[in-house]
């Protein structure tokens, strides 16, 4: 597997960064895209890296926030063949804050109906290609995390804490174990790993890639996450985006060589 980071908070050289995330993944002779970042930057960086978005065979949206979906329009303009897999719970209804402080942080308006022929929204765990799966959340009570993070979804005229039912993991099965991608891990990396473990009957997990959404947590809470990662037995965590520099430093001090930080243009071979 070859992974190229197209969009992340950290730029590198002539590759610009942004608050967003996008991965280009080559696996078993096919090309996948996970998320489109917060703008068209993923495509600009891809061109610099010699990656043609038109060649992507399959695209996946991790969740319905703007920093992972705002480049979808650019993707559909550049690519005429790939299906785009989203959660059936991904709607234009995600907000940060309440009242006068509320701001829309969701999908580009109209993006799903205007591309309905290519949007796929399977329910439950789905094998979208050979040895490639999307795994939705199956854990109750995640709305308490949404409340703490000041993240909400609009249902009618009501705003309720986000339970992240629109979030899903992208999982690849390899000969040496599972590779899990979860772009923001809003529910917690420990919850994601537990859900994937149940879905795949505790198959070995080779690596975990994505943001960990730790920038709002205290130092002690971040250390607790490090302990849970150690207890999981995963020996390769590659993170960035919403993890935050402070949290990454704490994780690095605990996990050492088991964790690395990605950036735009980084190529990861697994």
Enumerate the predicted regions with their spans.
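Divalent metal-coordination and catalytic microenvironments
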Residues: 25, 35, 46, 63, ...
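Active-site metal-binding motif and surrounding structural segment of the metallo-beta-lactamase
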Residues: 41-92, 200-207, 230
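Conserved beta-strand hairpin/beta-sheet module of binuclear metal-dependent hydrolase folds
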Residues: 1-49, 163, 167-181
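Short hydrophobic-aromatic micro-motifs
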Residues: 32-34, 128-137, 179-182
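Short, structured coil segments at secondary-structure junctions
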Residues: 49, 80, 115, 233, ...
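Metallo-beta-lactamase
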Residues: 90-168, 231, 260-269
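Cap/insert and terminal regions of metallo-dependent hydrolase folds
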Residues: 68-70, 161-169, 173-264
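Glycine-rich phosphate-binding "P-loop"
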Residues: 1-13, 150-161, 210-214
